[in-house]
Amino acid sequence: MPSRPRIVSVLLPQPLPEPFDYELPETLNAGPGSFVTVSLGPREVTGVVWAERATPSNRKLKPVQDVIGAPGLSANMRSFIERAAKYICAPSGMVLAMAMRSREALDEPPVETLVVRTGDTPPRMTPAREQALAQATEPMSGAELARKAGVSPGVVKGLLEAGALMHVERSLDPPFPLPDPALPAKQLTGEQAETSAYLRGMVREATFRAALLDGVTGSGKTEVYFEAIAEALQDPEAQVLVLLPEIALTQAVTSRFEDRFGVAPAEWHSAAGSSARRRVWREVAAGRARIVVGARSALFLPFAKLRLIIVDEEHDQSYKQEDGVLYHARDLAVLRASVEQCAIILASATPSLETLHNAQAGKYVHLRLHARPGVATLPQIALADMRVEPPETGRWIGPQLAGAIEQTLAAKEQALLFLNRRGYAPLVICRACGERLKAPDTDSWLVEHRYTGRLVCHLTGFTMEKPLACPHCGARGSLTGVGPGVERLAEEVHTRFRGARVEILSSDTVASADDLRSLIARMETGAIDILIGTQIVAKGHNFPTLTLVGVVDADAGLRGGDLRAGERTFQLLLQVAGRAGRADRPGRAIIQTYAPESPAIALLAAGDRDAFIAHELDQRRLVGFPPYGRLGAVILSAPTAEQVDDAARMLSEGQPNAAGIDVWGPAPAPITILRGRHRRRFLVRSDRNVDLSSFLAAWKERVKLPSAVRMTLDVEPYSFM
């Protein structure tokens, strides 16, 4: 009697809602988690066996083509993918695609062929052979051995034939060196030691626990969570994931890991090359990469035994992915820790209100570090009211900040000027006709970058040379930049503080990790007097002689209708101000503002974080916004305004009735046209006890939209553009 064919469900990294069934030939062996190649229409694609079906199918099924020898996805990883997909209202296949984004990782790493001694003596020994064997102290290529020994390649070939040497293969992806948790740590203060002891105990429990590590800038949060990492590494199979919000911060923190654990961690971020990603992915899957430091996408690596997750700077909005699959890495990190039954530490000097609320509700343990170690003190913060003391026409630095810069330079100390606008000018207009230059097919202003002589759309990446004449009216020489960017600020600084060594730190001026390391080294050694930067300067860089921080336009983040505008402004300015003063040098921050009475600005200057948090929570509670409710966004786009408006009407009419849910819209998105597509938005608010994800998914299922219309669901949106 013929054996019953095995049926496997294969999830594909495609925008598909569920796995497809395939027949597994008797010649192949695969189980849940195995990577396989299958046919999808005319194409051959790679997927993952999601389950094995006990009942045969009545349909003729395509066979699995092949089984790939890469380490499979664990049951925990598959569960995480399914639960994450449900939470963020995305097809499971698209979440799987994030776990498979390094396609080359599924291939066996390339190998090199080397020669080594066997220990046997050749029957005939010559001086040349003797020389070659004497040099063969470690594996190397035959050509390298011949060169090193000063003999011909034929001598090496003869030793191989005689059995005195043999070929061995070595992977070009070597294992990562093992970290040593027993290396001596920095001396901790009493407060730090008490906090680290609690975290160590939490890790030892080997179950899901979450802690908020809430410490002022410079309080030693990194040193404290290092001890939790050391505790996790006592288990020789344990792995640790440290998430960081920026590639820049990944580079800055690597040396600190080396100092504590003797080796650099494995790094995972978009700047890594394909071979580096292959190496990290496979070593993580095999359980040999013990500490992984990475950006948000590292969350989707296939860890074999994840025992601790750390989300550093957990408040940072760059943890929210705003294109492709929309998710917040902090929220999914908590979900992954729950699935893996491991500890998670959320660290920040300015925690998000959502995380603080969870700590207040007892879901997370709240651990606080109140002081900087040693004699270091927090910087003094002063407000410069620009309504009272405005800068001169055409300038952006007011008299109070200018005087402080002069004092700082005279004391041979460093200043940091913060302006969160890239480029030279955020807007280019024609003086003749008033036209504002926009990106093609997009409601987004073009930003002037004078260093490159180009106009850039920071939303779509469109770039063009600055035209000599206005494209609208043809007037020559009429285009002018309006408002300051970091390049324009640098121009003013060069003019006003002659002789000062000035550099800009932004994503435009730092093209690579090496560029960033070089700039940071110059700052650390005092080769820069004034550093001008965007928000990248707020993240984790400590400069010993930086004593002055100047915020050029504190009000920029308060403009617009973003519900988190005040929170984000407070967090960012507190982080930036915290760069000033370390060791025995007291720091100060001067914040230029036209709205000193704004709660975010006034309470920042007063140093009263708790009062600001209470104020923001009160405002959110009144309207049921996060953390007291949940938000979702539905974004529709289509080639024409008529198409998107028709789709919005269809969606409105198909809205399910549900208690505890409010729907606002449709309304034109603030960026009404993006890449030639017209956009409309709905905003959905739900009570905390309502399953918002299920509501959004059900709403999407109820309405069949035309193929020209795209619908995007965003759970807990951070951008309302």
What positions do the PLM features span?
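Conserved interdomain linker/interface between the two RecA-like ATPase lobes of SF2 helicase motors
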Residues: 335-347, 352-431
